[in-house]
């Protein structure tokens, strides 16, 4: 019984880890950057877009999404 419980616990931990790893791409909450009056800072926090472009930070990435009409998504955090 202890062995099956340990196996179940390890399986659950592995599932949670892999779910986090594979869900990195895709969605970013850009709500705070929808206003065209909001200007982006020069803070460096790269985002790799599905278009192969590296954006300097979340704000620049979100502005590109708006400009593209939602055609760009997050490929992964960091440089492309």
UniProtKB/Swiss-Prot annotation:
Spell out the InterPro entries in the cross-references: Kazal-type_SerProtInhib (IPR050159), Kazal_dom (IPR002350), Kazal_dom_sf (IPR036058)
Q: Where is this site: Reactive bond?
A: 42-43
Task: Tell me the first and last residues of the signal peptide.
Answer: 1-23
- State the UniProt keywords alphabetically: Disulfide bond, Protease inhibitor, Pyrrolidone carboxylic acid, Secreted, Serine protease inhibitor, Signal
Cystine crosslinks: 30-62, 40-59, 48-80
**Which terms in the GO cellular component ontology are assigned?**
extracellular region
What superkingdom does the record give?
A: Eukaryota
Q: Which ranges carry the Kazal-like domain?
A: 24-80
Q: Which residues carry this modification: Pyrrolidone carboxylic acid?
A: 24
Q: Please verify whether the record's keywords include Disulfide bond.
A: yes
Where would you find this protein in the cell?
A: Secreted
Q: What GO annotations for molecular function exist for this entry?
A: serine-type endopeptidase inhibitor activity
Write out the function statement from the record. Answer: Serine protease inhibitor selective for kallikreins. Efficiently inhibits KLK4, KLK5, KLK6, KLK7, KLK12, KLK13 and KLK14. Doesn't inhibit KLK8.
Q: Which PANTHER family match?
A: SERINE PROTEASE INHIBITOR KAZAL-TYPE 6 (PTHR47499:SF6), SERINE PROTEASE INHIBITOR KAZAL-TYPE 7 SPINK7 (PTHR47499)
* This protein's name: Serine protease inhibitor Kazal-type 6
């Amino acid at each position: 019984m202890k062995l099956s419980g340990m196996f179940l616990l390890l399986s659950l931990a592995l599932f949670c880890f892999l779910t986090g790893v594979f869900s990195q791409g895709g969605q970013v909450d850009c709500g705070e950057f929808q206003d065209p009056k909001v200007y982006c800072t020069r803070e460096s926090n790269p985002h790799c877009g599905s278009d192969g472009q590296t954006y300097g930070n979340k704000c620049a990435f979100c502005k590109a999404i708006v400009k593209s009409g939602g055609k760009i998504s997050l490929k992964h955090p960091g440089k492309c």
